[in-house]
Regions:
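Core alpha/beta nucleotide-donor-binding catalytic domains of modification enzymes
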Residues: 2-174
C-alpha cells in the first residue's frame, strides 16, 4: 500500500547517503487469494525495478491461527514478524523497517483504550523495539542476532504519505 511504498522509496533514496543496505521482504498471508498474489508480484517487480534484492514467502494464516489458537490478526502479525526477523538474520541486517504511521498509532491507542489497557498500553507503538521471540510464532527458528524493528513513519499521517506518493509519481497497490 501507500505506507510501505513510500517508506521503501524514501529509504532507497537515502541509501546512497547513509551506511545501510536495503532488502525488500513481503509475506503473503494466504488470506486474500488472487489479490494477494498480485500484491506479491507487484512488490517483487518494484524491488527489481529499483535494483533491490527481494524475498517473498506465502503462508496460510487461517490454518496457523486455528493450529495456534490465535485470532487471524495475531497469527498474521506473528507470522509477519517471524518472517521479517528470519530474513533480516539471513541477510545479516541490524534492523527491519515497517511502515506504521501516525494514523495506525492513533488506531492502536484507541483499540488499547477500548480494551481497558493500562497506561503502558495507552502509549501505543514505540518507534524502535528489539524483535524478540514473543513477536514470533512458536515454530519460528531461533534468531541469533539482535534485530531492531523500526517505524520511521510513526509520526507521519496517512494523508502526508499519500501526498508523498502522488508527488513522487508512485502508484502503490491499494
Amino acid at each position: 500500500g501507500p505506507d510501505s511504498t513510500a517508506l521503501l522509496d524514501i529509504l532507497r533514496r537515502l541509501a546512497p547517503t547513509f551506511p545501510f543496505n536495503l532488502h525488500v521482504a513481503h509475506l503473503h498471508h494466504g488470506i486474500r487469494g488472487e489479490e494477494a498474489d498480485r500484491d506479491m508480484a507487484w512488490v517483487a517487480h518494484l524491488a527489481e525495478t529499483w535494483g533491490l534484492p527481494f524475498t517473498g514467502k506465502r503462508v496460510d494464516v487461517p490454518t496457523i491461527a486455528e493450529k495456534e489458537g490465535l485470532s487471524e490478526e495475531e497469527a498474521a502479525r506473528q507470522a509477519r514478524y517471524g518472517f521479517l526477523g528470519l530474513v533480516a538474520a539471513e541477510v545479516k541486517a541490524d534492523s527491519v523497517a515497517v511502515a506504521h504511521n501516525a494514523d495506525d498509532q492513533a488506531e492502536t491507542v484507541l483499540m488499547h483504550f477500548l480494551r481497558g489497557a493500562g497506561l503502558a498500553g495507552l502509549r501505543g507503538m514505540l518507534p524502535k523495539i528489539q524483535l524478540g521471540a514473543y513477536h514470533f510464532l512458536g515454530n519460528t527458528p531461533t534468531i541469533d542476532r539482535n534485530i531492531a524493528l523500526i517505524r520511521p513513519l510513526l509520526g507521519v499521517s496517512r494523508s502526508m504519505i499519500e501526498a508523498y506518493c502522488e508527488t513522487h509519481d508512485l502508484e502503490p497497490r491499494l
